[in-house]
């Protein structure tokens, strides 16, 4: 195996024997094959589009397949093989539909040279799939800079795919996004592609990342209402309980409906914390609070929780034997020997009765005292405070906004973000989204004239809210350039959705981003130079030095 898609790449180079995340070599190689096959599917899907042939199932499958390969989503070789077999089926279907349309319109048989990813299929099962995955994986491209840019593009596409898939679950669609994902994948098959062409594609991916986040924002707010300022309890009550982690709000809503009147309290974990701010979800009285913190602490937090646990999307950490029997997966999440809740069929909700049954069998969890944290500062809510915020900026009460969105992770270096937040001057406000918030949302940083010094917009996809807020501030302050705002960026990344957010910021022209805790292993020195020269991206250094630079 060779994998370097997340911030935990072994020794800053890549994982070659087992992923730091827990991904095994067989799964890594199968995922590489699946990604390669999505490129082949995309080749035929784009050809078909030229001839007026569209297959919605094929188009969404490409996004779902990419999503399934994001860090900490799927650890199951069995599930990967199922994806691969389905990829072969759908590739043949869209290929056949294109060839028919081509022959009908052109009056001849299609005879262009076809990339291997659009044709290869041999019988031999999982062993052969693994071998092919090793052959067509990350290291296939020998030129370091071309490889770096192709992987940067692919990882951005994975993030876009994740956000788009979440929107599609809520019946909000955008064909242009899915077709761009396919375009990007097909372009990475080209052996003659240039650095300049790839840089252009990467920036275009940033634009589409904005579109994908906007689509998901519209889906979430249409379905669940605009987030409101909300206090969330972080303790637990002495009742049977279910803990929901991941990102899928519809899964949570369906579970809340199915647990009404059962005596079960439902708690959020990790990136599900923002669910409490949505009016349609907060009306459920048994949505009791948020237990625990960021994804990487789940091994201890899931064990301590004591109730049933539902994992709706990433980030799953390979579970301990001590609590494995009470962890359930659903959607694209995969881990062998965990009970999986099947997808919706015929428009019916998912059946969470196995989770509910387990929670009742386990009985009441311990009561734990907790504090309250304030969330709900998505763009609609912030726009209601905009006059107050503008007045604070103009009066000098707020000198800087510091965007500290992104991901959290297990490495000690991430304590930097807690210290950075603690040492920010009292005339600064943190804008955050994603699980990076857990490094500082428990700190008592106070407020500025009633404006909390930590404004939590929500999940990582709600980085879109931070963008909208920045653009509204730019307009209100009469500025021409987003970089003229009193906003600086200190972004923590972990996986591929954060890469999509980073590309979105670059597309919007944001300069001077500090990125940490480490730079991506897949960024070659020459590609890094392009990013530094064009966007002034820099790695974090020390808290003191970065405060000096960012607040100057």
UniProtKB/Swiss-Prot annotation:
Cross-referenced CDD domains: HCP
Similarity remark: Belongs to the HCP family.
Swiss-Prot/TrEMBL GO biological process terms: response to hydrogen peroxide
Record field: catalytic activity: A + NH4(+) + H2O = hydroxylamine + AH2 + H(+)
One matching Pfam family: Prismane
Residues noted as binding [4Fe-4S] cluster in the record, renumbered to the chain: 3, 6, 15, 21
Gene3D superfamilies noted in UniProt: 1.20.1270.20, 3.40.50.2030
Gene Ontology CC terms, in alphabetical order: cytoplasm
Entry-linked NCBIfam families: hybrid_clust, PRK05290.1
Molecular functions per Gene Ontology: 4 iron, 4 sulfur cluster binding; hydroxylamine reductase activity; metal ion binding; peroxidase activity
EC annotation from Swiss-Prot or TrEMBL: 1.7.99.1
Modified positions (Cysteine persulfide) in chain numbering: 407
Functional summary from the UniProt entry: Catalyzes the reduction of hydroxylamine to form NH(3) and H(2)O.
Key words, A-Z: 4Fe-4S, Cytoplasm, Iron, Iron-sulfur, Metal-binding, Oxidoreductase
Domain of life: Bacteria
Binding, hybrid [4Fe-2O-2S] cluster: 247, 271, 315, 407, 435, 460, 495, 497
InterPro entries membership: HCP/CODH, Hydroxylam_reduct, Prismane-like_a/b-sand, Prismane-like_sf, Prismane_a-bundle
Protein name stated in the entry: Hydroxylamine reductase
């Amino acid at each position: 195996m060779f994998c370097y898609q997340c911030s935990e790449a072994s020794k800053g180079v890549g994982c070659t024997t087992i992923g730091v995340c827990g991904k095994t070599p067989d799964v890594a190689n199968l995922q590489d094959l699946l990604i390669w096959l999505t490129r082949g599917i995309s080749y035929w899907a784009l050809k078909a589009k030229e001839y007026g042939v569209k297959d919605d199932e094929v188009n969404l499958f490409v996004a779902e397949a990419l999503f399934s390969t994001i860090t900490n989503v799927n650890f199951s070789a069995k599930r990967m093989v199922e994806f691969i077999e389905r990829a072969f089926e759908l590739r043949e279907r869209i290929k056949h539909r294109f060839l028919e349309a081509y022959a009908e319109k052109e009056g001849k048989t299609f005879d262009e040279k076809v990339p291997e990813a659009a044709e290869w299929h041999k019988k031999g099962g999982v062993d052969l799939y693994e071998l092919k995955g090793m052959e067509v994986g990350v290291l296939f491209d020998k030129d370091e800079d071309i490889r770096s840019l192709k992987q940067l593009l692919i990882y951005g596409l994975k993030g876009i795919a994740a956000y788009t898939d979440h929107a599609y679950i809520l019946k909000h669609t955008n064909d242009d996004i899915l077709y761009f994902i396919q375009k990007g994948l097909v372009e990475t098959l080209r052996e003659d592609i240039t650095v300049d062409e790839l840089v252009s594609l990467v920036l275009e991916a940033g634009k589409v990342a904005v579109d994908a986040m906007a689509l998901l924002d519209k889906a979430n707010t249409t379905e669940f209402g605009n987030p409101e300022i909300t206090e969330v309890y972080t303790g637990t009550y002495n009742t049977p309980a279910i803990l929901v982690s991941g990102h899928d709000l519809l899964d949570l809503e369906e579970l809340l409906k199915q647990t009404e009147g059962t005596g079960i309290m439902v708690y959020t974990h990790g990136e599900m914390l923002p669910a409490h701010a949505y009016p349609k979800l907060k009306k459920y009285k048994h949505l009791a609070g948020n237990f625990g913190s960021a994804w990487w602490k789940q091994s201890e937090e899931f064990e301590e929780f004591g109730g049933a646990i539902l994992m709706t999307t990433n980030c799953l950490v390979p579970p301990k034997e001590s609590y494995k029997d009470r962890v359930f997966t659903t959607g694209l999440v995969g881990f062998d020997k965990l009970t999986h809740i099947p997808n919706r069929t015929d428009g019916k909700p998912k059946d969470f009765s196995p989770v509910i049954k387990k929670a009742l069998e386990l009985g009441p969890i311990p009561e734990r005292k907790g504090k309250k944290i304030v969330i709900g500062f998505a763009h609609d809510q912030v726009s209601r405070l905009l006059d107050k915020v503008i007045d604070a900026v103009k009066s000098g009460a707020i000198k800087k906004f510091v965007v500290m969105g992104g991901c959290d992770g297990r490495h000690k270096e991430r304590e930097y973000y807690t210290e950075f937040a603690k040492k920010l001057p009292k005339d600064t406000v943190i804008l955050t989204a994603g699980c990076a918030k857990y490094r500082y949302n428990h700190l008592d940083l106070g407020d500025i004239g009633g404006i909390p010094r930590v404004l939590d917009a929500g999940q990582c996809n709600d980085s879109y809210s931070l963008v909208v807020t920045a653009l509204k501030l730019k307009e209100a302050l009469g500025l021409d350039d987003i970089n003229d705002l009193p906003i600086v960026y200190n972004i923590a990344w972990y996986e591929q959705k954060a890469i999509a957010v980073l590309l979105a910021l670059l597309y919007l022209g944001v300069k001077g981003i500090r990125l940490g805790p480490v730079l991506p292993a897949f960024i070659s020195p020459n590609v890094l130079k392009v990013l530094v020269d064009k966007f002034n991206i820099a790695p974090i250094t020390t808290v003191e030095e970065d405060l000096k630079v960012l607040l100057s």
